[in-house]
């Protein structure tokens, strides 16, 4: 079979930078799926993307589908011939339709009888006749929420399309993509190199674009180049660039020919909290801030131009002029905000509605304050600081700085709290109340911060469920799933001795009587348990392990986590499989017992050696297990229980549980019930697979 390399490029107007990677990856995934469906073999496939193009390169693509043998089954032999052995009309019609005679047909014997068959050879279709349609289908399936039309073209895409190129080796493949006829024309950089040129071969794409068109089409290469040059530029001025990957991705999606430059701003702006300056540099201008070895912001920034200028100083000056007003705004807001304490802003919270049925932000901070103090008392944190931090927690939302730079909420609250003379615990809690903000973010570790963060999230969860607005499907306008995971992570990762039922009840009490959903507390608990399952599954914990623990309904997250870890460890032990099966057998036996289960074991009724041995082993272990259960040392407890395997196996081998003698039967049921209860102190081991 012959092979060639394939290049498909779509030339467009500037594509949305935050969508560029997803578009390119989806285009590749959709197209390779088409190749697989069409039975077209290929070696590998990669995507390329730049602001004004999406491209795919497939190496060693088969030039045609492989020939196939297709079995075409005809009538049963019993109905294909008459009594004289002559072909029936049905058989002749089938044979004629397949271009053969009845005599040329083969026979196929199955368990349902004997049939006429024809194994027809179907020649594979040439790749070049399939490519354009497959590429169009791949484009049609791209995740584009708001497609647009342009000119007189009825076709829709995320941005106007100007060129389409499909090359199989050196051959131009005829066809259209999004209404644009395939041609060799590829567009270069807007301001450098050739505006457009003819591409002779699929293999020349990257090199020709770079040399002739001044475009680095390989997204990953462009991204790596920006990162390396930015790091070098920062090192030259004695600093380290803050190169967050999401910003690096966005910048790489904005430029075709990256040129890294260093600029500066006036040192007077460093009197403003660095987070506000960084916010405007990164968020508004797409600049990389620079920090010294001590983590202090330097009066410099690194930016990426999309052109090689003969006068880079002019570009640098232009960017400095652009950022200065934004930094001046931050300075003005900071100096203005400092004139008022956070406490003085409390009355203004009454003007901001949190939710129609749940009141204003002032109502919310009052609830947070009380709940945070309640939590702090249980965890040993400073309840006075927790109450104070809870009360002030949303006041920075009323500052000029946060209104303008919304992502600085909490952080600016911390700075303003310090300026107001609040305790450090209160100040830190102002910032950490929102943690974790995203998957992989850290959780607060300070006691007061944990109390306020938990109180805020629980107040929202209980309140929103209380008015019957639980998340439905993918919709989650109040980010309750994130809040729930936050609650669980804060408690688990800090090993806090908190019970969800108690916390939910307290939060519900603080909401008063305006919650209409009488089942809110149960629904919130179920919601948190469901998040527990999802969280542990994401961490690679087996579903059976999670279900085994969930069966015991532990409502203390730290305790839940200890059980998960213990059962995960237990499952790795050699004895776990046999003991899980034994527990399942015990559960099935006990489930059939009518009425209350017997619990008292009479040693005098232990007549069989195997039941005597099991009872003795349980009696030996129970004094050791009791303190382990009390201290939640579940892993050690299950390790000890794993030692019961031989005794349990022997018991089921030698002992008839459901004996005719009622007293013997009940005694053995009591023994099995006792055995099961030891495991149930941790989890329902019978659910392990």
From Swiss-Prot:
Localisation: Cytoplasm
What is a single Pfam family found in this protein's UniProt entry? tRNA_synt_2f
The main location is cytoplasm
Going by the entry's taxonomy, the superkingdom of the source organism is recorded as Bacteria
Q: Which reaction does it catalyse?
A: tRNA(Gly) + glycine + ATP = glycyl-tRNA(Gly) + AMP + diphosphate
| Top-level class of the enzyme under EC nomenclature | ligase
Q: According to its record, what are the GO cellular component terms?
A: cytosol
Record EC number? 6.1.1.14
Keywords attached to this entry:
Aminoacyl-tRNA synthetase, ATP-binding, Cytoplasm, Ligase, Nucleotide-binding, Protein biosynthesis
Which biological process terms from the Gene Ontology are attached to this UniProt entry? arginyl-tRNA aminoacylation; glycyl-tRNA aminoacylation
Q: What's one GO MF term for it?
A: ATP binding
**Can the keyword ATP-binding be found in this entry's annotation?**
yes
Quaternary form? Tetramer of two alpha and two beta subunits.
Among PANTHER family, the record links this protein to:
GLYCINE--TRNA LIGASE, CHLOROPLASTIC_MITOCHONDRIAL 2, GLYCYL-TRNA SYNTHETASE
Q: Which family does it belong to?
A: Belongs to the class-II aminoacyl-tRNA synthetase family.
- Recorded protein name is Glycine--tRNA ligase beta subunit
Q: Which organism is it from?
A: Shewanella sp. (strain W3-18-1)
């Amino acid at each position: 079979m012959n092979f060639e390399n394939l290049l498909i490029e779509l030339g467009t107007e500037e594509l949305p930078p935050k969508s560029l990677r997803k578009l390119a990856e989806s285009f590749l995934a959709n197209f390779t799926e088409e190749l697989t469906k069409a039975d077209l073999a290929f070696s590998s496939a990669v995507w390329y993307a730049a602001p004004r193009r999406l491209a795919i390169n497939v190496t060693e693509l088969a030039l045609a589908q492989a020939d196939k043998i297709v079995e075409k089954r005809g009538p049963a032999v019993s109905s294909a011939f008459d009594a004289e052995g002559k072909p029936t009309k049905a058989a002749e019609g089938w044979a004629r339709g397949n271009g053969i005679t009845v005599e040329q047909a083969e026979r196929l014997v199955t368990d349902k009888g004997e049939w006429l068959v024809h194994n027809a050879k179907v020649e594979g279709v040439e790749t070049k006749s399939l490519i354009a349609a497959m590429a169009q289908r791949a484009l049609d399936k791209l995740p584009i929420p708001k497609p647009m039309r342009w000119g007189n073209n009825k076709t829709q895409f995320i941005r106007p399309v100007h060129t389409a190129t499909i090359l199989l080796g050196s051959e131009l493949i005829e066809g259209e993509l999004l209404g644009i006829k395939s041609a060799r024309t590829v567009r270069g950089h807007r301001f450098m190199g050739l505006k457009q040129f003819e591409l002779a071969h699929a293999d020349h794409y990257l090199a020709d674009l770079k040399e002739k068109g001044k475009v680095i089409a390989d997204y990953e290469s462009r991204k790596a180049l920006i990162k390396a040059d930015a790091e070098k530029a920062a090192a030259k001025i004695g600093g380290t660039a803050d190169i967050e990957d999401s910003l690096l991705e966005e910048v790489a999606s904005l430029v075709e020919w990256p040129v890294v430059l260093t600029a500066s701003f006036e040192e007077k702006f460093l009197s403003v909290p660095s987070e506000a300056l960084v916010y405007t540099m990164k968020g508004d201008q797409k600049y990389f801030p620079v920090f010294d070895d001590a983590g202090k912001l330097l009066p410099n920034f690194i930016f990426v131009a999309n052109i090689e200028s003969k006068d880079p100083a002019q570009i640098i000056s232009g960017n400095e002029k652009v950022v200065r007003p934004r930094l001046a705004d931050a300075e003005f807001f900071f100096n203005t905000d400092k004139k008022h304490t956070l406490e003085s802003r409390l009355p203004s919270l009454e003007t901001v509605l949190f939710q129609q049925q749940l009141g204003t932000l002032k109502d919310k901070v009052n609830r947070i304050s009380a709940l945070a103090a309640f939590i702090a008392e249980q965890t040993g944190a400073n309840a006075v600081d927790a109450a104070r931090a809870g009360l002030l927690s949303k006041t920075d939302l009323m500052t000029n700085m946060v209104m303008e730079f919304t992502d600085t909420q909490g952080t600016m609250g911390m700075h303003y709290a310090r300026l107001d003379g609040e305790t450090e615990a209160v100040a830190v809690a102002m910032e950490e109340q929102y943690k974790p903000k995203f998957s992989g973010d850290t959780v607060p570790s300070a006691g007061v911060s944990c109390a306020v963060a938990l109180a805020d999230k629980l107040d929202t969860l209980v309140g929103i469920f209380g008015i019957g607005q639980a998340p439905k499907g993918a919709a989650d306008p109040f980010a309750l799933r994130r809040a729930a995971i936050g609650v669980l992570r804060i408690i688990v990762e800090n090993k806090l001795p908190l019970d969800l039922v108690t916390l939910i009840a307290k939060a519900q009490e603080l909401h008063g009587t305006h919650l209409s959903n009488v089942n809110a507390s149960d629904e919130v608990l179920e919601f948190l348990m469901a998040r527990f399952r999802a969280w542990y599954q994401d961490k690679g914990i087996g579903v059976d392990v999670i279900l085994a623990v969930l069966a015991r309904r532990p409502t203390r997250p730290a305790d839940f986590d200890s059980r998960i870890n213990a059962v995960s460890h237990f499952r790795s032990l050699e004895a776990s499989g046999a003991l899980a099966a034994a527990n399942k057998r015990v559960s099935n036996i006990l489930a059939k017992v009518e009425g209350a289960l017997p619990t008292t074991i009479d040693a005098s009724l232990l007549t069989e050696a195997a039941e005597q041995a099991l009872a003795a082993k349980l009696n030996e272990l129970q004094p050791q297990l009791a303190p382990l259960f009390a201290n939640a040392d579940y892993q050690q407890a299950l390790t000890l229980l794993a030692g019961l395997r031989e005794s349990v196996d022997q018991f089921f081998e030698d002992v008839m549980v459901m004996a005719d003698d009622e007293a013997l039967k009940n005694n053995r049921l009591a023994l099995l019930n006792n055995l099961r209860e030891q495991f149930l102190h941790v989890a329902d081991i019978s659910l392990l697979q």
